[in-house]
């Protein structure tokens, strides 16, 4: 039987391949036929007009025989091509394909007969012509207003032990579209010895049964579908077989929801009835026992120990800059927007460009010279040598010039760029590296963020003759320990990192030092105060660069002040 099916399938495939070849050949032979007819017509025109012999003044009869031979040859070729074309057209294999099959095998619609899509559900229950009281109702629903003579006879088979009291419960019981009560088998897969009383709740519908979902409503078909003439083999003729099929599908679905332990008979849906106690289901209910969640080991920006700094102290520092008290209430929103700006404007594009440069280096035959693997010195040399081929490498190297451990820096930048708002940020440490915890030989996340922020503004500020290395912003507005800013100079406006581990940042402006509380927000609040002063007291200008909408576009985080 299997060999015969394979031969049938191979024959079908061979036929479709042949049809595709003939479809392509039809176009070719038709083109050649038209070309041969055209050439034969041109030669015949020359034979009657004698243009070549007259123009070149040569003997006419030898040329006439040559032209006659060519005209005959082209005419025969044209006849042969047209005969092949009509052969492919009239004698094509007779095969019936659905539109999806025609698209799959690539057979033109004109060469195959179209057939409608087969119905996905072919097993249906034959039902005789329904009586007027059955019109518009589900065959698995129960209507209390229906008389016993009009009730379907298989209801007692589908729901064993179900004996409803047939009573006239509604005044419009004679209407063809009566209100019905539909008992869903999804909630009660098997109901035994159940007899509803007239006082039972009724779920009414004006146009048919209530759709409660489940497999029975999924496999049901409307009564109008049963009257359509189809093959007898497409029906389930045994009502018990239908009931068994529905129950088995419900049992499979229930076991799939409970998991592999539901294979025992105690968890079978046929055992869920009113005669069993709760203790019988202890094994199943144990799967859904309430348990406390385990504490996540992932780093979180909300669990730092140093985040217990006094909010009141921060408000006192901000009060020296912001005179309007309600603005201080927006500090959390400003911090979130600023973190998101760093991620979307610097981190994500930086990681993308690093991966792009790594791909370009491999294409140039330098697989050993990669970002995250080679030293910063090698990358700087490559940026000079490969500048015409990879112009962005020189820019990326500036962001990576913070630690000798390039592998850790590359992986940490990728981790920080995930999540949209630097969710893995750790202000006084960093991430794990090769299975070991972060140590002081690696830069903190605060140092990394501060470095890339300064490098980004270095690239936006115009070059300055005092700073040939291009670090204009870093040289003017960032001082790192052990160096100290000149507080006596009124023009000094910078961010001072007074401590490396743990990192601590202060703002120096007009001979004043603004020391915000330590913790995970110290870096962001210091930078926010730096930007806020630029917006409110420097007209949004950092030197000759506008940090507003027409420039760097970072001051939008404060909104309209």
From Swiss-Prot:
Q: Which Pfam families match?
A: CytochromB561_N (PF09786)
Q: How does it sit in the membrane?
A: Multi-pass membrane protein
List all membrane-crossing ranges: 28-48, 60-80
What is the protein's species of origin? Xenopus laevis
Q: Where is the composition biased (Polar residues)?
A: 125-140
Specify the glycosylation sites in chain numbering.
94, 273, 343
Question: How is this protein named in the record?
Answer: Transmembrane protein 209
What are the boundaries of the region Disordered? Answer: 120-149, 191-233
- InterPro entries found in the cross-reference section: Cytochrome_B561-rel
């Amino acid at each position: 039987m299997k060999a015969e099916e394979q031969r049938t399938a191979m024959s079908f495939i061979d036929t479709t391949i042949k049809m595709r070849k003939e479809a392509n050949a039809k176009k070719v032979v038709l083109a050649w036929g038209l070309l041969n007819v055209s050439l034969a017509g041109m030669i015949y025109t020359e034979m009657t007009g004698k243009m070549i012999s007259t123009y070149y003044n040569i003997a006419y009869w030898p040329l006439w025989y040559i032209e006659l031979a060519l005209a005959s040859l082209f005419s025969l070729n044209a006849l042969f091509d047209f005969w092949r074309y009509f052969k492919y057209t009239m004698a094509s294999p007779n095969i019936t394909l659905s539109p999806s099959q025609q698209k799959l095998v690539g057979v033109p619609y004109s060469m195959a007969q179209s057939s409608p899509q087969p119905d996905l559900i072919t097993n249906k229950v034959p039902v005789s012509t329904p009586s007027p009281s059955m019109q518009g109702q589900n065959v698995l629903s129960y209507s209390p207003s229906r008389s016993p003579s009009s009730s379907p006879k298989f209801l007692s088979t589908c729901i064993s032990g179900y004996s409803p009291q047939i009573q006239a419960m509604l005044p419009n019981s004679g209407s063809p579209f009566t209100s019905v009560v539909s008992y869903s088998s999804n909630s009660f897969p098997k109901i035994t010895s159940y007899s509803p009383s007239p006082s039972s709740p009724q779920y009414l519908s004006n146009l048919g049964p209530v759709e409660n979902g489940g497999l029975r409503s999924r496999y049901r078909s409307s009564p109008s579908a049963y009257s359509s003439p189809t093959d007898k083999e497409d029906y389930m003729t045994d009502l018990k077989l239908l009931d068994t099929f529905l129950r088995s599908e419900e049992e499979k679905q229930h076991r799939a929801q409970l998991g592999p332990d539901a294979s025992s008979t105690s968890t079978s849906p046929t055992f869920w009835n009113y005669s069993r106690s709760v203790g019988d289901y202890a094994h199943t209910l144990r799967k859904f026992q309430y348990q406390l969640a385990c504490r996540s080991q992932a780093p979180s920006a909300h669990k730092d120990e140093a985040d217990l700094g006094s909010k009141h102290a921060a408000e006192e520092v901000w009060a020296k800059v912001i005179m309007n008290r309600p603005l201080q209430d927006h500090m959390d929103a400003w911090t979130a927007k600023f973190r998101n700006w760093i991620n979307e404007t610097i981190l994500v594009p930086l990681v993308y460009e690093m991966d792009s440069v790594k791909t370009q280096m491999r294409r140039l035959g330098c697989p050993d010279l990669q970002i995250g693997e080679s030293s910063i010195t090698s990358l700087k040399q490559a940026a000079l040598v490969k500048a015409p081929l990879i112009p962005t490498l020189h820019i990326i190297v500036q962001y990576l010039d913070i630690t000798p451990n390039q592998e850790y820096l590359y992986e940490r930048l990728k981790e920080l760029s995930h999540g949209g708002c630097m969710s893995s940020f750790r202000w006084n440490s960093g991430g794990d590296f090769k299975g070991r915890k972060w140590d002081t030989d690696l830069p903190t996340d605060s140092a990394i963020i501060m470095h890339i922020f300064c490098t980004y503004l270095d690239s936006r500020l115009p070059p300055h003759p005092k700073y040939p290395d291009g670090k204009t912003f870093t040289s003017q507005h960032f001082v790192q320990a052990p160096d100290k800013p000149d507080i006596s100079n009124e023009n000094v406006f910078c961010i001072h990192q007074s401590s490396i581990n743990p990192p601590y940042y202060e703002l120096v402006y007009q001979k004043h030092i603004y020391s915000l509380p330590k913790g995970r927000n110290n870096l962001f609040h210091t930078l926010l105060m730096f930007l806020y002063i630029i917006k409110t007291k420097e007209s949004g200008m950092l030197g000759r660069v506008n940090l507003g909408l027409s420039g760097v576009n970072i001051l939008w985080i404060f909104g309209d002040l």
